């Protein structure tokens, strides 16, 4: 419960703490997305090349473990698997960070610990030998930081304070600014100057974020002490789940592999797509070679526009026709997203027949189609799981929902290995089939289980709002 005064409106009508938290999050996300934009390119084009890979401490053990599952990997294939594992575990570690904050350290100490670990990890990326230790620091740091700083935003507001929703919109706007700027700044330094300059810029961003957080701590509400005896005495006896709740629970868990497939094209944007673009796309603009990492800035801008446009579209639609339910929106989103890799099937055909690189517009087309689809899958799915999960398991089920991103990233890391051995038309065609097939499965789920998922009076909150949901960065 917040201890902030209701009349605290120092930051655009919100508590001053929101400004500090949003600015801190901007720099943390700048460091994260700046490093992510460079990672697969750095591994493929430099660190995992035969003349350099021997410098990496622990590479024999890591490579042996990966190749024990996948078979021998080329530098690009190994880079894609490592990137996929890193990007996947980013969605698991916040579960443990939340437990650490709730039961041991408290949110503030956990956030500071996470920021220090991430800054350390970014600077360790400057040394080839410490690469895997750097990734470990980053993963643990993200786990400590990510969920807990968002929880502190909620702590600024008393229950029922109507400013809470717009507070998270402001918070997410800071994230979107970082997602756009990070690939431009860190990517340009990494590709045009030296890889370590890009990683160093990400580290500087994290240090700034830590300084901002420490400076703004006095504006955050104090954390209440937990009275375990009182909590135990006040505990309400658990009631058994109803048949509807059990059915929904089974269905929501069973949907995770389907949701994994819906975002395969989206998650590939940071893995195989920059590698494909580097080889087959003409990135010269007005005589200047545009860094490949800038494609991610284009995608971030398209993602922001798609999220806002989707919300506006469904609000407009609801004034004229009956609005579709969440599953239908997600199915439509998947089918739209499938058009993005399908577009690259055409581009790959042009490359194969003309032996010339394709233009910049194909990257923009991929980003726009993918992000329109993603805007109707990811946040809408979040709303579906929030509404239909059994109330006493809502927190667990929200964590379970993010499991599909862990699975998608690890799967995409393996799938990206086929980029070297499979013709481009087949490679991107496979992605289009996987994403489109998931959309068809979601339509089937709607037909068979529509009544089970339909809104009821006992749902958690209301049915999904138009275009629902929180702004979620595309990658």
Task: Describe the predicted segments one by one.
Residues 288-319, 332-341:
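Transmembrane alpha-helices of Major Facilitator/SLC transporters
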Residues 90, 163-191, 198-209, 299-303, ...:
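Glycine-rich segments within core transmembrane alpha-helices of 12-TM secondary carriers
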Residues 1-17, 159-160, 186-287, 309-310, ...:
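Intracellular loop-helix junctions on the cytosolic face of multi-pass helical membrane proteins
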Residues 144-158, 376-389:
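Intracellular juxtamembrane helix-capping segments at the cytosolic ends
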């Amino acid at each position: 419960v917040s201890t902030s005064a209701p009349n605290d409106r120092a930051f655009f009508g919100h508590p001053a703490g929101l400004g500090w938290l949003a600015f801190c999050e901007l720099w943390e996300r700048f460091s994260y997305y700046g490093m992510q934009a460079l990672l697969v390119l750095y591994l493929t084009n430099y660190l995992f090349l035969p003349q350099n890979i021997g410098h990496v401490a622990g590479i024999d053990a890591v490579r042996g473990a990966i190749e024990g599952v996948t078979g021998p990997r080329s530098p690009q294939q190994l880079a894609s698997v490592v990137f996929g594992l890193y990007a996947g575990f980013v969605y698991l570690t916040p579960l443990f960070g939340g437990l650490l904050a709730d039961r041991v350290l408290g949110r503030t100490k956990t956030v500071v610990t996470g920021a220090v670990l991430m800054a350390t990890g970014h600077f360790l990326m400057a040394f080839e030998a410490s690469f895997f230790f750097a990734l470990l620091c980053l993963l643990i740091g993200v786990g400590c930081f990510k969920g807990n700083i968002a929880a502190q935003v909620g702590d600024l507001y008393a229950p029922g304070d109507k400013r809470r929703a717009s507070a998270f919109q402001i918070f997410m706007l800071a994230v979107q600014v970082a997602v756009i700027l990070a690939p431009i700044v860190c990517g340009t330094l990494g590709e045009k100057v030296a890889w370590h300059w890009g990683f160093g810029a990400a580290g500087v961003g994290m240090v700034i974020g830590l300084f901002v957080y420490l400076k703004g701590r006095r504006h955050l509400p104090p954390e209440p002490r937990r009275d375990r005896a009182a909590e135990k005495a006040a505990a309400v006896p658990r009631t058994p789940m109803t048949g509807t709740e059990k059915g929904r629970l089974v269905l929501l868990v069973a949907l995770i592999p389907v949701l994994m497939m819906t975002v395969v094209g989206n998650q590939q944007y940071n893995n195989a797509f920059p590698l494909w673009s580097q080889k087959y796309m003409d990135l010269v603009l007005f005589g200047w070679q545009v860094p490949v990492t800038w494609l991610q800035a284009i995608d971030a801008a398209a993602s922001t526009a798609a999220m806002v446009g989707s919300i506006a579209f469904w609000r407009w639609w609801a004034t004229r026709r009956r609005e579709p339910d969440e599953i239908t929106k997600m199915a439509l989103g998947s089918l739209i997203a499938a058009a993005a890799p399908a577009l690259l099937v055409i581009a790959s055909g042009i490359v194969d027949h003309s032996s010339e690189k394709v233009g910049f517009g194909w990257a923009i087309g991929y980003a726009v189609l993918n992000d329109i689809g993603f805007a109707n899958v990811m946040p809408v799915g979040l709303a579906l799981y929030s509404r239909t999960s059994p109330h006493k398991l809502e927190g667990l089920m929200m964590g379970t929902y993010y499991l599909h991103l862990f699975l998608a990233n690890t799967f995409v890391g393996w799938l990206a290995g086929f980029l070297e051995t499979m013709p481009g038309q087949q490679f991107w065609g496979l992605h289009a089939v996987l994403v489109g097939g998931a959309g068809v499965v979601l339509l089937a789920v709607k037909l068979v289980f529509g009544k089970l998922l339909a809104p009821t009076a006992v749902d958690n909150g209301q049915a999904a709002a138009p275009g629902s949901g929180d702004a979620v960065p595309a990658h």
